[in-house]
Amino acid sequence: MKKRNLELYLHIPFCVRKCNYCDFFSASGTEEEQAAYVSAMVQEIQSYQELSGEYEVQTIFLGGGTPSLLTPEQIEQIFNAIYHTFSVNENAEITMEMNPGTVDIEKLHAMKAAGVNRLSIGLQSAQNEELKMLGRIHTFEEFLETWKLIEQAGFKNRNIDLMSALPGQTIESYEDTLSKVLALEPEHISAYSLILEEGTVFYDWYEKGKLDRGAWKLPSEEEEYAMGELTILRLAEAGMHRYEISNYAKPGKECRHNLGYWDRTEYLGIGAGSSSLIKGERFDHIRDRKAYIEKIRNGESILIDREILSVESQMEEFMYLGLRKVEGVSRIDFQNYFGKNVDDVYGKILDKLEEEQLLEFSGDRIRLTHRGMDVSNCVLAEFLL
């Protein structure tokens, strides 16, 4: 029997400190808590022995939090459990997120020995004042030191995270960041525009009017748009094509894990706060780290939510995830998945969005226009049935 493709996502919810813009599930923790958490993760991985026989793992992604806070021994522990439990494709893409200043050459060698072949480094800005305002734990100079270590360790598939539309950021400071980053010749760049999320320090500042004036004034909509256009232009000049709303890569260096997610490949989340999609069912893990550790130790369920996806929900996901990609979605694929013509389900919406020049049709494919990409959140919301 042919094995089905599977993606693994491992959540490492530990940070030195939480950044001012971050609403991800993460917080600082003691060495003892981190060790206990890793032991619990290993137990969880081993619990999937029966399920694992049906799948071959194509991608593994360690996200957070800051996975690079793991010790070399903990990295080895986690990957030993994965390789003993799952069948992992020999060409699997294995990504680890990291922050500058949290690794040394020994840790990078441990990552490589464990099979990690792609690194995603959170830089966000090359301007030290902006980094300080973001609540980052590093300077640009410290990032450069980490980058040298990454090169020394021999990693050839490297993503750098950048942010635009930051408080106090100017078009000039953002262009300087792009220039400095492109000079390093990374294989991939994820470029995000700041979103003010409830529960973050930035949202609190915004509510209090601190981002309306002074040194940390938010850029205007026109400036934010200009930064977005600058990103596309400068990265294209550097040989990096845009393949998704916020992601750019050199040919062949697209993030396979994220592509799998947008293409609705089955995925298994491991760790507190992670989510899974297996056999048409979505389930979420308990978010509290201590409760997660205790429940794993006691053999209790760590699930807090289970949902068997209806056909309508699957159609929605097919459209709003697939349309994030520059290549868009395939009419034939929709027909094959659901036994229905996409026009019978979404005809009126497709016609309306094409008329508004937010969508375009080319042969079999439906995709966002350049303008549609700029207002993608509004466009994608149209596909909720």
PLM region descriptions:
Residues 3-5, 26-50, 55-340:
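C-terminal scaffold of the Radical SAM
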Residues 371-385:
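Short, amphipathic alpha-helical interaction segments positioned at domain boundaries
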Residues 334, 350-356:
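Basic amphipathic alpha-helical segments that dock to polyanions
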Residues 354-364:
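A short, conserved structural fragment
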Residues 13-24:
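Local cysteine-cluster metal-coordination motifs and their immediate loop/turn environment
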Residues 1-6, 16:
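Flexible, acidic/Gly-rich N-terminal and inter-domain linker regions that tether
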Residues 340-352:
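Short amphipathic alpha-helical interaction segments
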Residues 365-369:
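Minor-groove-contacting beta-hairpin "wing" of winged helix-turn-helix DNA-binding domains
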